[in-house]
Structure formats: structure tokens, C-alpha cells
């Protein structure tokens, strides 16, 4: 592919950006997108109609943490957004007013007894820090003093609300560690899951802790863009279910780009998947050959974003530009709290 960003750019009216989810969640629009056919609008609760008995649906079971923290170092105010936990137990974070931070600096969080020590100032607003507590004590600390790191396009002048605490969590949430919600999962309700079960569609989960980098557009060139690493895991049970589904001719249906990116990171050339644990920074763009995923359910993404490039790689750039033009013309709602599309993979 070329390094031209123009095919991945489009004008999105501001009033198309959803600031609240659909209620109920499964009443949001689901746009069925198939290469070579016009976009076909439905609603989320229709999802089972487009899947087949024996298909395997895979969702991300990460749970969002309260990743935004207000810290001080002496008189200086430092804003932190936790990005991902590192192998040594410290945290990578994006920091505002971080220029003067240096190793061994101690950060305080109001009157809370928990502190953090700066391990490294990486520059460009990135730091690694170690907290004075871990495990359940750390989780309790985040609940006391942290706030949800809502995407910047969900405007909350007074910060995230109690309603956001409920709205920005998926029905699959199990393992804490994500900065951002895997938003395709936000649409699922117990009723939708029951309908999938009734049709004989299997379900498994994986874990990818979504980092703050998911919000970043490509600002320079495609070739120069560097993806942020995110930690994920596919356990042996899920890997076996994928391989069994593939062997008997079923399709792998990824709920969200996070699930797809981890599946493709773990996939072998023949489309089978091994148990996997570690960090991935996979950047999927047109020209990529998909190995693991056949169908993708995902929300509508930002212009010039790596996620829009991913869906263009999956279903074809012209197909996705047509689908997004349809969505804009028909008032569909974009981004985290918005509507979704069900994408069939281009041949």
C-alpha cells in the first residue's frame, strides 16, 4: 500500500459522535457490511440472524480500571493516565507536566497514603512508575482516587459520571487492566447472548488490556506510525475451541478490533492459534493477509486512525468508505458509545 492518508480520511459532523449509549444496549444500529453489496442496516439484537450454527464468537473479557490519576510532586501537579502494566510490576503511564520528572521522584495523590515512585522518564510524556501497593490494595486505591479515562470525544466537563461507570463496562468484563473499554462488547445484553446460545453459536473470551494509545490518530505517515504495545492472553481452552471450529468449517467471529488484533497476533499461517501470552503492537493495514478471523463486529472509528485502516484491510477500503458514507448520511452514531457494524472479510 502507499503511505497516503487520504483514503482513510473523512469528514464527520460533530453531532454524529455519541456521548451516551443506546438504551437498551441491543437497540443500537448494526450495519451489515459485505464486499460488493450495499450496506444493510439492522439492530444489534439481530446479530444471531447473521451467524451460523457452529460459528465461534470471541469477545474481550478485559475490565476497565480507573486509570486517570491526579498526582503531585512537591508543588507541581502531574496528570497521569495509566497505560499498561509492565512485566516487572511497574506501570507505563502517559503524563501531563512530566518534563521535570526524574527517577526516584515520589508522587502523591492528595491525602491518600499510597504513593508512586518514578522509575524512568521516557520523554514525550511517557513515564514508568511503581506504586507502593499492588494486588487488591492497588485496585482499592484506584477505586478511591482514580477516574475513568473516557475518550476525549466523550465530553464530560465535570468528569465521568456514575452512569459512565456502568455504561463503559461490557457484559464480558472479568480481568481488570484496560484503560479503554473494548467498545464492540458494550452492545451485548443477556438477551443477545441467550439468542446466540439458542442458535448453537459458541462463545469464548480472550484478554487484551486496551491502552490509551487506542485513541491516537496517525499524525505523520503510515510508515512512521508506531503502535503502542498492549498486553494480552489467549488461554488453552480458547485456542482449542478456535482450532476445532476451524477444522469443522465454522467461522471465527471477533467482537471488536482488540479481539481481532490478538487473534491475528497469535495465528499460525494455517489459521490455527496457539495459547498466547505477552504484548502485541500489531499494526493491521491494507495489504495484510488475515489468518484467524472471518467476521468482525466493531464500532465506527475515527478518521485517519489505525482502526479505520484495520477495517479497510478487512473488508476493502472502497467497501468501508461506502459503509461510512452511508452511516454519516443516515445519522448513525460514531465511536465508543455509538452504533456498530458487522463486517464480512473480503476474499
Curated annotation (Swiss-Prot):
Q: Which reaction does it catalyse?
A: 7-aminomethyl-7-carbaguanosine(34) in tRNA + S-adenosyl-L-methionine = epoxyqueuosine(34) in tRNA + adenine + L-methionine + 2 H(+)
Task: Tell me where it mainly resides.
Answer: cytoplasm
The enzyme class is: transferase
Pathway this chain belongs to? tRNA modification; tRNA-queuosine biosynthesis
Keyword Nucleus among record annotations: no
User: What Enzyme Commission number(s) appear in the record?
Assistant: 2.4.99.17
UniProt GO MF annotations: S-adenosylmethionine:tRNA ribosyltransferase-isomerase activity
Q: Which GO terms describe its biological process?
A: queuosine biosynthetic process; tRNA wobble guanine modification
Write the record's keywords in alphabetical order, separated by commas. Cytoplasm, Queuosine biosynthesis, S-adenosyl-L-methionine, Transferase
Pfam entry (one): Queuosine_synth
* Subcellular location per the Swiss-Prot or TrEMBL entry: Cytoplasm
InterPro entries given for it? QueA, QueA_dom1, QueA_dom2, QueA_sf
| GO cellular component entries | cytoplasm
Whether Transferase counts among this entry's keywords is yes
Question: What's this protein's family per the entry?
Answer: Belongs to the QueA family.
What function does the entry list? Transfers and isomerizes the ribose moiety from AdoMet to the 7-aminomethyl group of 7-deazaguanine (preQ1-tRNA) to give epoxyqueuosine (oQ-tRNA).
Under HAMAP family, the record lists: QueA
| Subunit and partners | Monomer.
Give the protein's recorded name: S-adenosylmethionine:tRNA ribosyltransferase-isomerase
> What organism does the UniProt record list as the source?
Gluconobacter oxydans (strain 621H)
Amino acid at each position: 500500500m502507499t503511505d497516503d492518508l487520504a483514503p482513510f480520511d473523512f469528514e464527520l459532523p460533530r453531532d454524529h459522535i455519541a456521548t451516551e449509549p443506546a438504551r437498551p444496549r441491543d437497540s443500537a444500529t448494526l450495519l451489515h457490511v459485505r464486499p460488493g453489496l450495499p450496506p444493510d442496516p439492522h439492530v444489534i439484537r439481530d446479530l444471531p440472524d447473521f451467524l451460523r450454527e457452529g460459528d465461534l464468537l470471541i469477545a474481550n473479557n478485559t475490565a476497565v480500571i480507573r486509570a486517570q490519576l491526579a498526582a503531585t510532586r512537591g508543588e507541581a501537579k502531574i496528570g497521569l493516565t495509566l497505560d499498561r502494566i509492565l512485566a516487572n510490576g511497574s506501570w507505563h503511564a502517559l503524563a501531563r507536566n512530566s518534563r521535570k520528572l526524574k527517577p526516584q521522584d515520589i508522587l502523591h495523590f492528595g491525602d491518600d497514603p499510597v504513593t508512586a515512585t518514578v522509575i524512568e522518564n521516557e520523554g514525550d510524556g511517557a513515564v514508568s512508575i511503581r506504586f507502593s501497593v499492588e494486588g487488591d490494595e492497588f485496585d482499592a486505591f484506584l477505586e478511591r482516587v482514580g477516574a475513568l479515562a473516557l475518550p476525549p470525544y466523550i465530553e464530560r466537563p465535570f468528569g465521568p459520571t456514575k452512569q459512565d461507570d456502568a455504561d463503559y463496562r461490557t457484559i464480558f468484563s472479568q480481568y481488570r487492566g484496560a484503560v479503554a473499554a473494548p467498545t464492540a462488547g458494550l452492545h451485548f445484553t443477556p438477551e443477545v447472548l441467550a439468542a446466540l446460545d439458542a442458535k448453537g453459536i459458541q462463545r469464548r473470551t480472550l484478554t487484551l488490556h486496551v491502552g490509551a494509545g487506542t485513541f491516537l490518530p496517525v499524525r505523520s505517515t503510515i510508515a512512521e506510525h508506531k503502535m503502542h504495545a498492549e498486553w494480552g492472553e489467549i488461554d488453552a481452552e480458547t485456542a482449542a475451541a478456535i482450532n476445532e471450529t476451524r477444522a469443522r468449517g465454522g467461522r471465527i467471529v471477533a467482537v471488536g478490533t482488540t479481539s481481532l488484533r490478538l487473534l491475528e497476533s497469535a495465528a499460525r499461517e494455517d489459521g490455527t492459534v496457539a495459547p498466547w501470552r505477552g504484548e502485541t503492537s500489531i499494526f493491521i493495514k491494507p495489504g495484510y493477509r488475515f489468518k484467524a478471523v472471518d467476521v468482525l463486529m466493531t464500532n465506527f472509528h475515527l478518521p485517519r486512525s489505525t482502526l479505520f485502516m484495520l477495517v479497510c484491510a478487512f473488508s476493502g477500503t472502497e467497501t468501508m468508505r461506502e459503509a461510512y458514507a452511508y452511516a454519516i448520511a443516515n445519522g448513525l452514531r460514531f465511536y465508543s458509545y455509538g452504533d456498530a457494524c458487522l463486517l464480512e472479510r473480503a476474499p
